[in-house]
Amino acid sequence: MAKKVVAVIKLALQAGKANPAPPVGPALGQHGVNIMAFCKEYNARTQDKAGYVIPVEISVFEDRSFTFITKTPPASVLITKAAGIQKGSGESAKGSVGSINRSQLEEIAKTKLPDLNCTSVESAMRVIEGTARNMGVAISD
């Protein structure tokens, strides 16, 4: 019989830099999970993606064991890196703070495709394009 899941914890952590300090410690500690074991495993899995924020979904079982799935970085993080800006515009309707070209947009869409509710790269590109527009990042051809 399969183990019963008692909790699902969602966190967004810097790749390769998980440590027992908040937010990791309190989130896992209240469910009795071995925090250091999670940190070591997460850091090992994400060390090649340094500099990105990697969302993680942790399933905690009733015997206090756990499994976790890492997701792709948020679209906003990928867009800001591609555009070379610190953050998106607070007033995206008034003007753009940066721009990315179609090839960069396609690269981001291919990266995000497994986590998006899309089947083709073209539809994923439209989703990412909308995110970029809302951030005040222009798309150039």
Swiss-Prot record:
The GO terms this record gives for MF are: large ribosomal subunit rRNA binding; structural constituent of ribosome
PTM (free text): One or more lysine residues are methylated.
The record ties this protein, via Gene3D superfamilies, to: Ribosomal protein L11, C-terminal domain (1.10.10.250), Ribosomal protein L11/L12, N-terminal domain (3.30.1550.10)
A Pfam family of this chain: Ribosomal_L11
| HAMAP family per UniProt | Ribosomal_uL11 (MF_00736)
UniProt keywords (A-Z) are:
Methylation, Ribonucleoprotein, Ribosomal protein, RNA-binding, rRNA-binding
**What protein family is recorded?**
Belongs to the universal ribosomal protein uL11 family.
Quaternary structure (record):
Part of the ribosomal stalk of the 50S ribosomal subunit. Interacts with L10 and the large rRNA to form the base of the stalk. L10 forms an elongated spine to which L12 dimers bind in a sequential fashion forming a multimeric L10(L12)X complex.
For this entry, the protein name equals: Large ribosomal subunit protein uL11
Keyword rRNA-binding belongs to the record: yes
Instruction: Look up the domain of life of the source.
Output: Bacteria
A cellular-component GO term for this protein? cytosolic large ribosomal subunit
The job of this chain, per UniProt, is described as:
Forms part of the ribosomal stalk which helps the ribosome interact with GTP-bound translation factors.
